[in-house]
């Protein structure tokens, strides 16, 4: 059995997710279509300090595939042809900064996860992690591991 204090519903990758506080896992996500046997209890909802200040719309954009984790500032560089994709993912208010004639940079908070790396890898050489170096190095290591499978 799970007990969760609900905070928000978000739409991600064709599914609704409940963002909630779990006694076991803290801030977590549950895919709504996978829920069964729900019960409303008389237990008071847990409202953490984190939840009181969290912008759930922004949070939903930072999380890829609803993987939990700590959000961190990530600076990315894309070819101009991907501007529409970035705006679709992060919203029309995303600030795209020109970087030469063929690229732009974009800085945002992202929960770094395998799903984020997979999304980025799909763009091949048209996208690059610029900062932080730890995220850049982890992505490069993931790419090397995958490449080893094909040698």
Regions inferred by a protein language model and the residue ranges of each:
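Polybasic (Lys/Arg-rich)
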Residues: 58-151
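Core beta-strand-centered patch of the WYL/Sm-like small regulatory domain
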Residues: 1-65, 70-75
